[in-house]
Amino acid sequence: ISTYSFERLYQDGGFTRFDAIDKTKEYGCQGVELVLDDKTPDGSTPMEYAKALYAHAKEQGLEVPIYTTGANFFVKEPEKELERLCRHIDIAAECKIPLLRHDVAWGYYEGYTGIKSYKKVIEAVVPFVRQAAEYARERGVKTCSENHGYLLQDSARMLELFAAVDHPNYGFLCDMGNFTVVDEDCATAVSALSDYIVHVHAKDMLVRSGMNFDPGKGYNLSRGGNYWRGTI
């Protein structure tokens, strides 16, 4: 289970990521995915916080196969984003977590005046994704990215990204349900990317046609205007 699965419970401060690890063990799982960013809830450094979580997971007998954090290389200063991401790679390396998942791009940044094409985005981010993969290789960590964020979420676009990065230390975190968000058949999409998969998020979706009425609370709109809702 990912610590992100408990995200709503962290908001009031009464439930922590340490509690999430305990609950993961209680559910009978064998491992936990640590999802962390640049801030910590207790004032410790990201390195200190991650090490404490990792140690707690190990005390509970849980494996920590992957470290997840955000990233966005389609920005005005991608060099700074690469430097920031490398600090998270250092954390994963120090904790001996073998895999790190990072985002690639979240959308067109404010002030962008170029052609709004995902191909332009791929062209811009590839050098930095590749540099992150190489830096991680030197630290004994493998990097990966997920079909996530609308802009680079379809299987065809992800395939273009992996072909362009072309680095043996960079793979695909396959979210089985996220293809629904861009109106793609999940089974077909997963099959197309199977050679690149290094980690999987198991997820199922409820889907309703956008030609019908809004099904209500909990449903979101896909890129094509259909309704979807996660079930796991």
Q: Across the structure, where does each feature detected by a protein language model lie?
A:
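N-terminal pre-domain/capping segments
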Residues: 1-99, 117-120, 127-130, 137, ...
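Acidic/histidine-rich catalytic cores of soluble enzymes
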Residues: 31-32, 67, 130-232
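Active-site groove signature of glycoside hydrolases
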Residues: 92-118, 139-152
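Active-site-proximal loop/turn and secondary-structure-junction residues that shape catalytic pockets
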Residues: 5-7, 36-38, 70-73, 104-108, ...
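Glycine/Thr-rich phosphate-binding loops of Rossmann-like dinucleotide-binding domains
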Residues: 42, 110, 210
